[in-house]
Amino acid sequence: MRHKLLFSFFIFLIVALPIRSKDFVLTSGQTVVIACSPSEEQVVRTALEMLGRDIQTVLSSTTQTNEKTGEIVIGTVGQSELISRTGIDVSALKGKKQAFLLSVSPEGKLIVAGSDKHGTAYGILEISRLLGVSPWEWWADVTPEKKKLFKLSSKFQSLQAPSVEYRGIFINDEDWGLMPWSSRTYEPSKVKGEIGSRTNERIFELLLRLRANTYWPAMHECTLPFFLTKGNREAAKKY
């Protein structure tokens, strides 16, 4: 009888003790597995590539994409089963444009849910910001600090949505600045007045990191129009 009572007591302790939620932790040198559906839009895949580079820069870690599970789980609400499987409440994203939710699950996974494709992309690059990567890392030579460990509390949650619908950059007075730098230095071209696709892609990358969605390209008479420049249309589609 005494043994039965002790056994029952231990069972009670096991049942009564709460399950402790885990922090989200990445360590230097590990392979970071990211769960993301291959059906996600191109801008989401572009943001994933950028995050992969940022993780390599900050943690000296490689990334690997998996369709089912990972330390980071990414998806667009209503389009990705990965998000619905996590069981996290994404109702706060309903009716919002280009919004995202970052949340650490009880298992210690970082969940990134977007209300639409750009919301998901912005959420992915919020991880880069949390890692310490500035949106201006390339244009202003802001080298991020190396880390051995990156951790988010088990209670971490961040819901963000834009307060202004259209946010972007207008390229002005390119005659003496961007255009000659692009055509003579960054991507030398024999085409007069050309701001090449590599230059524009760097601008698009900055826009995505800044969560901008509008681009007014250079329009002075000395500059070749945006859509007449080879590769610009294809570059824009990635972002």
Feature map (PLM): residue ranges:
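Short hydrophobic "helix-edge" motifs at membrane interfaces and signal-peptide entry regions
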Residues: S8, S105-G108, N200-R202
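Aromatic-lined carbohydrate-binding surfaces of glycoside hydrolases
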Residues: T31, S37-E40, L59, N66-T69, ...
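Contiguous, structured surface segment used for ligand recognition
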Residues: S21-A161
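Bacterial N-terminal signal peptides
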Residues: F7-A16
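Bacterial N-terminal signal peptides that target proteins for export
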Residues: M1-F7
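Short, low-complexity interaction segments enriched in Ser/Thr/Pro/Gly
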Residues: M1, L17-I19
